C-alpha cells in the first residue's frame, strides 16, 4: 500500500519501521522541523527523520499545514493512506481527507481515556494498572475518530513513563 507517514519522536519510529518491514511503499515522511539542541544550538533531527533517512525515505518538514502548500504536496504524493503517530501538530481536515482511504492514528492510550497530549504520563501519574494503544480513523475532533483496533497492556507499579513509552511504541506498531 502507498502510505504517507507522519511522526516525530521515538514513539513514532516503531510504527514507521514496521510499515517499512512489511513492505509498504512509503511515499513520504512528514516530521517536525529540526530544532536547536544543547548549548551550541546545533540543529537536531527528529528520531523519525533519522530513521527515515537511514532507510532512504524522502522526508518533508513543513512549517505550515494550513496554507495549502502541504495539502498540494500530499496530493502530489498521492498516498492511499496516511499513518500518523505522534506527529506533534493538529492536522487540518483537508489533509486528513486527502488520501483515498483517509488517515489513521496510533494513539498511546485506550481511547476515549486520555484523549489529547501526554496520555502515557497521565496513565503513570494516575497510577493506572492498565493502558494500551488505540488505532483509529482521524476526524476533525482530536482523538475522536472511529476506533479500528486497540490493545492493552498492564503497567508495572515501578514502571516510568519512558519505559512505558517504549513498550507502547512497539505495541502500537504491532496492532
Regions found by a protein language model. Give the residues of each.
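A structural microfeature
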Residues: 28, 61, 148-149
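N-terminal glycine-/serine-/threonine-rich beta1-alpha1-beta2 phosphate-ribose binding loop
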Residues: 36-78
